[in-house]
Amino acid sequence: MTDFEKTYQNYNPRQAALDEARALLTAAAKAAMADGTLPEAELPAFIVEIPADVKNGDIASNIAMAGARTWRKAPKMIADALLAHLPSIENSVFSKVEVAGPGFINLFLSQSFWAGVVLGACANKEYGRTDHGKGAKYNVEFVSANPTGPMHMGNARGGALGDCLSAVLDWSGYDVTREFYINDAGNQIQKFGKSLAVRYLQKYCGEEAYPLPAECYQGGDIKVLAGEFAELNGDKYVAACKGMDEETLFESEAFAALKDALVAYALPKNIAALKRDLGKYRIDYDVWFHESTLHESGAVKAVVDKLLELGACYKAEDGAIMYRSAQYAAKYGTVNKKKTEDGTEEEAKDEVLVRANGIPTYFAADIAYHYNKLATRGFAKAIDVWGADHHGHVARMKGAMDAIGLNGEDLDVVLMQMVNLMRDGQPVRMSKRTGNAITLTDLLEEVPIDSARFLFNMHDAGSGIDFDLDQAVKTDNDNPVYYVQYAHARICSILKKMESEGVQFAGAEKVDATLLTEPSEMDLIRMLAAFPQEIVMAAEKYDPSRINRFVIDLASAFHRFYGSCRIQGADPAVQQARLALCIGVKNVIFNVLTMFKINVPEKM
């Protein structure tokens, strides 16, 4: 990396300009108070922001309005006083500062500032990456599908959301760990084993002899796994299970042995399938964390003991250990409730952590798991991506972190709304191939992975998605990812064409980008300036979808620029500046697509 390129490492021009504006206005206020123009007072809280209309400046501030009560003067008088005491802007990024309307202060950025944006985006191939997060350790846990069956459309959305969120956090300077929590213990595994065992017995004795209970998993995948196990093991488990009524069978040692054998066979296969499909979806986890290890290591018991010691739990008459959930959850929102004994009203509900039979609940393991993240492994933040149907669990989980001596604010939950698959404008429920509910496997066989990852990240987590299967397979501008990829390929084509005509790009350090003043050029430059801060905002708001929308707008702005500003045949100095602008846009599109693990074609 050259010294010139190092100048633009971790470069965030928009934030730098906002910070400089705040510093100038703060200095002006202090100077005005020092000479008595404004009365001495604590500086009011004020805003510096990017106005919607560039006619109102590149940056605007409400400091005069915010200070009206503090300084007991009209906002216009305050604004004029601040302007009179403003430090020289000669060596700043600003070319002009003015008062507008009732007292807004508008600041205009210099052409040399905008030129620096072009050069930074052109010279720094990782333009957009900043050190905003200062290396803070963040854990992002997402998908974490039960290994008892195939992944569904919610997992497809959660995979794209969690992976793209991890990417914007990484690009914002956080030390990110991507994690999958494998629910390989508890009731769902018992249910999985029971479902497999009944299907296995049906294979040899028929469905009438061993009807599948309603609470068992009904999917065809259970039959397939049980059939595979039968092919490997034959009927050696059947005889020991015969001659018992249903209740006796399900409590018998023979049935328990059959369940254990089936789970030992089927669970690793399902986990391997999860890993295979998520790998195909381009998700690479740093940690696969097994719930079972929390039980085997004694971590669940240790957490329950700690909560008892802290008075957050108590023992009920039947021996169950109860957690005082409402006491801690109320701070964070919804408190789970139950009916009073007479059924007339609702009261706060305490939660069972350990049942009367001594078996811990899923909630106890969940507390132990998050304690492991925040205390044992020392993450500054644990971010969980959950389906919106789990909203009732958020407050009690955050409250549990407080109860155990941690900070519930260090656990953040991103709630994700539903996905509706659409074809020909109609909802699609079943796979044409299997006749069953559409799985992630089915989706990735029909839809290009680039489209799936981009389209599932087009909306913020709180919005539902109608995923259009017809749109996802299109190879034209109706498909947003194609539109963005085409903009990149078009720039590559322009650069190659110029080279073929003997026009070589001289390098960013030799370009005079102050020559770029056309409206379409300035639109592009303003977008380039915003890019690093857009990534930071996406990270802070846990909303990577804003980057998808940004890059679509950038592609549109580039097409407008190319339609109105000639590169071929332009004045040589202007031509070099426009090539630098093209390369800057190309770098940003490349960085967005690679950040989100989407292919970046150079020709289409």
Model-derived regions, located:
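Non-catalytic interaction-recognition regions
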Residues: T2-A115, A123, R129-M604
